[in-house]
Every structure is written in C-alpha cells, then in structure tokens.
Amino acid sequence: MNTRFLLLLCCLSFTTFSQPFDAIKQPNRSEEEVTQLAEDFKDWSKASNGWRYSFITANEKEAVEDFSISGYQTANDYLRATDTSTWGVAGADARQYIRTVKSALNKLPKYKGTAYRGTWVKLSLLNKLEEGDVLVEPAFTSTSTLPEVAKRFSVVHPNSPQRLKRVLFEVKINQGGHTIAGLSEYSKEAEVLFAPNAHFRITQIERTSNHTYIGVETVKASAVKNTQKYNLYSGEEVEASFWHSLVCT
C-alpha cells in the first residue's frame, strides 16, 4: 500500500482507538509530517469528488478559494450580526456570496470522521455548558483533520471586551462536513467546512486552567427539539422561535 495513503489513514483515524482529547493534547508532530498529511488529505479530497462536482461552476470555485483567504470574514460577520438592516449594498453582496459558497459545498466531497477546531469562547457560555447541550453556530464553521492546525487558531487572544477562554473542540462528524482542501488556497489546513447553522451536541467537557476541551458530535436540527441550545457565538440561549427560523432558512 502507498506510504502516503497509510499516513493519511493514520491522520483520519488518529482518535479511533484513543481516549477523548488524546490527539489534541499530544505534542505537535513535525512541520514536515503535518505538511505531508495535509497534502495527502488534499489528494484524497480531489480523488473523492463525486458526480455533483461536475456541476460546480467557476464562480463557485472562486468563492471557495476566496473564502479561505478573506471571504470568511465578511460572510461570518454578516451571519453573526444581530441587525443586518444597515449593511445596504454590502449586505446584498454578502447574501449572494454566502449562497454561492453554500451551493459549492453541496458539490464538494463529504467528510465523516474526526476533526478539530481551536477558538475562543465567551466564559459566560462555558460556565453554563453541560454534556448533552447543543451548540448552534450561525456562521460557517471551519475545522481541520489535523489537531496541530486547529491549535494554531487559538494561540492569539482576540481583541474583545468580553471575557474569553481558549477552547479546543474535538468534532465527531456524522453529517454536514465537506472538505474544501481540494480548492482552498490554504490546502495545508486540511479543512472541513460546515454550512451556517450547524448543530453540535456536547458529548464531553474537560475544563483546565488554560483550556477547555469540548467533545461534540454533529446532529440534525430536527433531532434536538427538546434540548438546551446555545448560540456558540453570542452565548445566548436559542429560543424555540429562533431555533425554528434557523431550521427553515
């Protein structure tokens, strides 16, 4: 069997037989090894393109490429905004761009397995989270199959008046994840992307002084009607009417 393919299998199965959070707690592998694993994941992504990929447009490809560079900032800012009425023409452009990226995702390979995300979360939200709660991300959610990549995104504390804490997510992807590694300008990130309003059920939480480790699994919105839900960005409880609007948009 090809050595590079074996490395990829090792990468994708990193936590198959390990304890929760083992992979993300391990010392980082060498830059050379991480780069090679990312390249292998990119190759796998390209090889996994199915019949839907034949319908992807040049505009959609360009949108995904731009998303990985800077487009994610505008798209996610718009999706997380509580009031978009003041966006004007920029709002219309953002909505069109978001639709284009979502359309592209539906034509890119699905990924099922484990991925990781490093970020900063409001301490007020972290303090009330329990296993079984569901986190709803109103924006696109970026993850990586490489824990080393995920950890890079939680190094620098954001400039925010809110009290934040570093969080490392271990994500069991059952649905909704699409690899953009074959198109992304940052293919070394081995990125798996979720469309807006992805739902993640908390399966395990481990709190330390420096980090909070959270294990989650992807779930359908329709499967968590009677579950405590929180907006991952704002930290606010997702009310039933708001939850319904997320499902129906």
From Swiss-Prot:
Domain TR mART core: 31-223
EC number of this enzyme: 2.4.2.31
Reaction(s) catalysed by this chain's protein: L-arginyl-[protein] + NAD(+) = N(omega)-(ADP-D-ribosyl)-L-arginyl-[protein] + nicotinamide + H(+)
GO molecular function, one term: toxin activity
Top-rank EC class of the record's enzyme: transferase
Organism: Vibrio splendidus (strain 12B01)
A GO CC term attached to the entry: extracellular region
Described purpose of this protein according to its UniProt entry: A probable mono(ADP-ribosyl)transferase, it may ADP-ribosylate Arg in target protein(s). Upon expression in yeast cells causes cell death.
Keywords, comma-separated and alphabetical: Glycosyltransferase, NAD, NADP, Nucleotide-binding, Nucleotidyltransferase, Secreted, Signal, Toxin, Transferase, Virulence
Entry superkingdom: Bacteria
Protein name: Putative NAD(+)--arginine ADP-ribosyltransferase Vis
